Amino acid sequence: MSWLFGIKGSKGEGTGPPLPLPPVQPGGEGSGDGGAGDRPGPKDKWSNFDPTGLERAAKAARELEHSRHAKEALSLAQMQEQTLQLEHQAKLKEYEAAVEQLKGDQIRVQAEERRKTLSEETRQHQARAQYQDKLARQRYEDQLKQQQLLNEENLRKQEESVQKQEALRRATVEREMELRHKNEMLRVEAEARARAKAERENADIIREQIRLKAAEHRQTILESIRTAGTLFGEGFRAFVTDWDKVTATVAGLTLLAVGIYSAKNATSVAGRYIEARLGKPSLVRETSRITVLEALRHPIQVSRRLLSKPQDALEGVVLSPSLEARVRDIAIATRNTKKNKSLYRNVLMYGPPGTGKTLFAKKLALHSGMDYAIMTGGDVAPMGRDGVTAMHKVFDWASTSRRGLLLFVDEADAFLRKRATEKISEDLRATLNAFLHRTGQHSSKFMLVLASNQPEQFDWAINDRIDEMVSFELPQREERERLVRMYFDKYVLKPATEGKQRLKLAQFDYGKKCSEIAQLTEGMSGREISQLAVAWQAMAYASEDGVLTEAMMDARVQDAIQQHRQKMQWLKAEGSQPPTLRTQAE
């Protein structure tokens, strides 16, 4: 069973007994040099070997060799050997396949490396080409710069050459002019010497010629005077001796003087008549009365005004219920007065600014079918001496109205002040007297309406001429809400829905917002609320998208409130009473 241990013996040779194993020595060898017995010596490599397994294997081999199944065991061993060889061959194939796969991976890696190398070479070539292109561009730019510098240098040299040539030409011209001037001076000097010499030589002849010319001129003048005197004398003698000519001449001159004087006065009278009938006085700022010039300029508007029907006196005017009832009674009474051709009553409207006095006066005139004219008291004082004439022209012009005229005097306290206590000029005093003279009696031609913020400054004679006094107070919360809604509809809603203007309105509760604004604007007048609505419209137009938002309205309301407070502070600083407190005191 040598094959069991991997040892090949000769053919037909048996296997002897197993080789004896060397005995195990538990201890060391004898003593040696250096006292070897004192320390342990090196152990043998077979000292820890257990031979039991080998003995069992040898025993099994002997039994197998003497057994009758030795051949089958040998065949089995050979088959196992073949199986091992096949397994080794399979492993070899796997190894070869692994080697081939490794070669394939190496080839793929080499291809990838080659691709990367080519890509890197391409990138390097591109970078080299870009760098070469950059160098070429820089070289081209340098060439252009050099060429530009060369051109500039050539241009500079050409300019210098032209300047030198111009300087040389200028010097040549100056030299030529200098020589010409010298020659001219020499010529003039020579001519002067020659002329002086000739005059010295011909002095007697020249004096004789001058004497003869003077005598001839004197003789001519004397003869002309003598001839003219003779002609005038004979003509006057003939005119005086003929009495018919004298009479006709005197009559003609008299008629000429009368004609010139008559034409001058007739022109003045006609001008005053035309001014009173057709023109507009200088004190009148605004009027609804139609003039010839206005009819020629705006015929369509004039025709619409003539065909328009009387309007409601309180249309567009927001007042408190009590005041509204009172002014409506005044409007009805005025309209009936015009229908019955009776005498008009004079009205005084007083109160803070912006409460609707002027607006109601216009509406009252339109409701009554009358014309209106507006003048301001501040225009009277600057006229000086012409104030009396201008005041008479206003009342003369008002008396010529066929429909009746409502004369509205705004800021009347500016010239209708107290004559006893106020310091007014003589011209203004005379104008006030003329006003009192023309308003001393009621008229069926015009109705006088005065408006003032300080009625206590009126002259007592003015108060005596007032038939009705109406106090316009600041709007309360209900009136303010009506005003806010009216002006919001006029300046915001209508332009946003009807017009073609660039105005849009954001979505929010308009009614609630108007109520909130009316609550916040306490103490404001109707004019201030109107200005607030106009400011909303302006903010919408000023925005980029043209949309009026709730925040924009709130911001403008806060600005208006702050401005109103500032105005009230200024009024208190001046020592005047604010309109709200003044109204409450009254």
UniProtKB/Swiss-Prot annotation:
The keyword Mitochondrion applies. GO terms for biological process: antiviral innate immune response; DNA damage response; HRI-mediated signaling; mitochondrion organization; negative regulation of apoptotic process; negative regulation of PERK-mediated unfolded protein response; regulation of cell growth. One of its GO terms (cellular component) is mitochondrial inner membrane. Residues 55-218 form a coiled coil. The modification N-acetylserine is found at S2. Residues 1-52 are annotated as: Disordered. The modification N6-succinyllysine is found at K490. Residues 263-586 are mitochondrial matrix. The transmembrane domain and a C-terminal adjacent region contain all information necessary for mitochondrial targeting. Can form homooligomers. Homodimer formation at the N-terminus may be regulated by ATP and is required for the interaction with the inner surface of the mitochondrial outer membrane and correct mitochondrial homeostasis. Interacts with components of the mitochondrial ribosome and with other proteins involved in mitochondrial RNA metabolism. May also interact with protein involved in lipid metabolism, including STARD9. May interact with FAM210A. Interacts with GADD45GIP1. Belongs to the AAA ATPase family. Essential for mitochondrial network organization, mitochondrial metabolism and cell growth at organism and cellular level. May play an important role in mitochondrial protein synthesis. May also participate in mitochondrial DNA replication. May bind to mitochondrial DNA D-loops and contribute to nucleoid stability. Required for enhanced channeling of cholesterol for hormone-dependent steroidogenesis. Involved in mitochondrial-mediated antiviral innate immunity. This is ATPase family AAA domain-containing protein 3.
